[in-house]
Amino acid sequence: MTTDLQAELETEVERRRNFAIISHPDAGKTTLTEKLLLYGGAIHEAGAVKARRAQRHATSDWMEMEQQRGISITSTVLQFEYQGYQINLLDTPGHQDFSEDTYRTLAAADNAVMLVDAAKGLEPQTRKLFEVCKLRSLPIFTFINKLDRPGREPLDLLDEIEKELGLQTYAVNWPIGMGDRFKGVYDRRLQQIHLFERTAHGKREARDTIVDLGDPQIEALLDQDLYFQLKDDLELIEGLGPELDLEAVHQGKMTPIFFGSAMTNFGVELFLNAFLDYALKPATYRSSQGAIAPTHEDFSGFVFKLQANMDPKHRDRVAFVRVCAGKFEKDMTVNHARTGKMIRLSRPQKLFAQGRESLETAYAGDVIGLNNPGVFAIGDTIYSGQKLEYEGIPCFSPELFAYLRNPNPSKFKQFQKGVSELREEGAVQIMYSVDESKREPILAAVGQLQFEVVQFRLQNEYGVETRIELLPYTVARWVVEGWPALEAVGRIFNAVTVKDSWGRPVLLFKNEWNAQQVLADHPKLKLSGIAPVVSGQQPEAL
C-alpha cells in the first residue's frame, strides 16, 4: 500500500461515526433522528411524523404505510456531514414486530444510541434490543427523552439502567427541572448551563442561552428551588458516581447519559457534539481471514439489507452495503464471495432515506447503495484483493405463522415476484410445507404487523390482493444437523415439519412445552431457535 493511500484511509476512518438508534415504540426515535439531521444541516425544517397532512412526513419514514401510520417499519440510512465528521445514522424500525430488520442493521453499526422515555424508563423492546447490542459489545449512548413532560426522577432512571442492564452510568449532562418547569440542562463537560427557548414544535435549531454555573444571574434565571436542587444533584453524582471511562464505554460496559427533549430540541446538539467525541470510530470486523482492520488496503464490505421499490417510479431494488475496509470507488470491479463472480459496481449511491445521489468514493463505516438485479442476498460479502467472507447474519425465531393465499390465478406471476422480492429483502421469513400438494408459502413472522405489511406491499407495489390463513403454531426450531438427523429419529409427535427458504428442515410447535417434550423423547436430536447463518447461500427458487 502506498503511503498516500495509507494516510488517506487513516484520515477518512478517523472522521467517520456510524450508529443505530434503538428504542421502544413511541419513545421518540423518529423525532430524535430528524432533530439530529436538523442540527447536522441535512434538513432545514423537521417534519414531525404525526404532523397535519398538509405538512410533510418524517424524512426517515418513506414507505407509504409508514407515513399513513406514523411508525417506522423499515430500516433506512441517513448520511450527513457535521463539524468535519461523516455521520452514518442507521434508522431502525421502532415497532416491535420488526426486530429482525433491527438486528440486521445493528450488524452494520459501530455504536448504538438507546432512547429512553423519561416517564416510562426501560421498556420491553429496549431491553430486547439492548441484548442484541450486548452480544456485539457495541458502545451504548443513552438519551433520556421527553424531559419537557412529567417523568421519573433522573436518579431513579440511572439506577434502573444500572440494575437491569448491568451498565455503569455516567451523566454527561443533567436536567434542570422537568415537565412544565423544565429549564434546560447542565453540561458537565464544560460546566455550563444551557437554558433553552422553545421553538415552534422544534422545527428549527433551538436558540440557547449558555451561562456558567458560577454566574451571579443564574439564581435569577432559575427558580430558587431548581437552582438548589441542581447543586444538590451535582454534588451527589460527582461525589458518588464513577468517572467517565471511555475504554469501558467502547467495550459496552459503561453508558454515557444525556437528558433532553427531541420534540423541542432540548439537549440534542449537546448530545451530538459529545457523541462525536466519545463514539467508537469504524472498528475491525471478523472474517474468514481473521479480523479485518478498517484501514486495510483492499476494499471489502457486506450486504446487511435489501430493499425493493424504494422509488415506486422505478421499481428498483437496492442492496445496502456496510463498507468494512479499504476505499470504495465508483466503477470498481469486486469479487462476489458467494458466487465467485466478478461484478462491476457502476452505479453506487449515497443514501438518504428514499433519496439517492451518485457516489464516487466511500470508506469504512459508510453505507452505500448498490443496484441489485437479483445478484445480492443478505449476508453477502464483496471484496477486492485476497478472498474473504464476513460472518453471516442469523435470523430471529418467528412466533406467528400463516399461509399466504393468492385468490386470483391471473396474478400468479406478480404474486410469485412479490413474495420472492419481499423474502430477499427480509421483510418476512418464508417457509413451505413438505407436502408437495401444498404450494402456498407460509409466512413466518415475529409479530402480526409483518403480515399486514406483506399484504399491503403486495397490493400497493405488485397489484396483488392476498388472504392470510393463520396457523396454530408459536415456536419454530431448526434441525441443526439437517434432514438426515430428522429422518434418523423417525416420526415426531406434536410437531409439523416444514422447510425454510434454503430448503432446511424446521419443526413448528404449538407451544414451548411441545418443543421440550420432543427433545426429551429424542435426546440425540439437536434443535436451534436461531436459523443457521445464511452467508454463502442463495434461497431456493420459489
From Swiss-Prot:
tr-type G domain residues: 14-283
GO terms assigned for molecular function: GTP binding; GTPase activity; translation release factor activity, codon nonspecific; translation release factor activity, codon specific
Q: Which PROSITE patterns match?
A: G_TR_1, G_TR_2
The GO cellular component terms are: cytosol
The family database entries (InterPro entries) matched by this protein are listed as: EF-G-like_DII, EFG_III/V, G_TR_CS, P-loop_NTPase, PrfC, RF3_C, RF3_dom_3_sf, RF3_GTP-bd
**Primary localization:** cytoplasm
Q: Does the keyword Ligase apply?
A: no
Location of this chain's protein in the cell:
Cytoplasm
Q: Does the keyword Zinc apply?
A: no
UniProt GO BP: regulation of translational termination
Per the record, the similarity remark reads: Belongs to the TRAFAC class translation factor GTPase superfamily. Classic translation factor GTPase family. PrfC subfamily.
Q: What does this protein do?
A: Increases the formation of ribosomal termination complexes and stimulates activities of RF-1 and RF-2. It binds guanine nucleotides and has strong preference for UGA stop codons. It may interact directly with the ribosome. The stimulation of RF-1 and RF-2 is significantly reduced by GTP and GDP, but not by GMP.
Q: What name appears for this protein in its UniProt entry?
A: Peptide chain release factor 3
**What organism is this sequence from?**
Cyanothece sp. (strain PCC 7425 / ATCC 29141)
